[in-house]
Amino acid sequence: MKKVVGFGDYILRLNPEGYLKFIQADKFNVFYTGAEANVCTSLSYMGVPTEFVTRLPENAIAECALSTLYKYRVGTHHIARGGERIGIFYVEKGASQRPSKVVYDRKYSSFSASLPEHYDWNGIFADAEWFHFTGITPALGDKLPGICLEACRAAKERGIKISCDLNYRKNLWSRKEAKQTMEELLPYVDVLIANEEDAADVLDIHASNTDITSGKLNREGYIEVAKKISDKYGIGAVAITLRGSISASENDWSALLYVGGEAHFSKQYRIHLVDRVGGGDSFGAGLIYSMINGFNAQTTVEFAAAASCLKQTIELDVNLSKPADVFALMGGDGSGRVQR
């Protein structure tokens, strides 16, 4: 099996213990994360060869970050070194009616100062079959939109499948900037992952009769959105995650995969959330796993949705679920009974 390549930032996650608010915290738990890294790590845990490409400084904190990738057998051979710092991501976990909060401190990170010469795409893609990036990556630095475009062109020349998660972050760039950049990248993309907010914010495409704050989700509206995206940008497969928010602790979760002019919905899961950060990344990993293994469209969306459901019951950003765990949930085993 050839490898899946992910390209993006790798940052330090700090969060208070349990459900403490920032103002209550006198210590923080440490983890290392990044959207594309989470996808690679989840896939590696499922047995898929992966390579994560980023840029990290030459210091002890970066070495700790690398050790996390080593632990899960994620390839690091093409990580560039240099720059001053690793970005930081603070997470305050919400509960019930209190939402989670996130604070970023990632300006001037090594990755944000990336230059085209830091990445040899010929070498990176030498034994790859899939390339994954998100809309976070081009938002992080002046040169990164061009670097992403160069990577997409190199992948496309080699017949490598390309997936992208829109992942719009309003504190990184404006809607106008995001739309302008992503519309240049999307023609290269084979599989696009989004949610209803991303589609509206970045592409100005909206789901009819849907209120994400009330948990009201209209299936026909999402099919309309997926079709518009597919038709406008020539994208073969569009996946949309559907989150109905009951509270910060309880969500309904399902997904739509639109491919070949047909819509396929997964079953819906009611999740008591443990940690929703990384839920979209685990969905992306499940989607990629399914597609490289040749699953049909319905099985693909069921697997991706179930994988992501399991992730949101796991602390921190990475889905540490094996394919057998996912298939068990798909088969109806969601009781949570002790396995002996």
Give a label for each model feature:
Residues K156-K161, Y233-G236:
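A short helix->loop->beta-strand "cap" motif at the edges of active sites that frequently abuts
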Residues F31, N38-T50, S290-N293:
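Alpha-helix C-terminal capping segments
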Residues P49-I136, V326-R340:
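Conserved N-terminal subdomain of the carbohydrate kinase-like
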Residues H264-D333:
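Conserved post-catalytic alpha-helical subdomain immediately downstream of the catalytic base
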Residues K27-A37, T54-P57, I79-G83, D275-G279:
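Active-site nucleophile and cofactor-binding loops and adjacent substrate-binding regions
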Residues M1-K21:
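Positively charged, low-complexity intrinsically disordered leader regions
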Residues G146-G159, T181-Y188:
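Catalytic-core regions built around general acid/base machinery
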Residues L172-G260:
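Conserved phosphate/ATP/ADP-binding segment of small-molecule kinases
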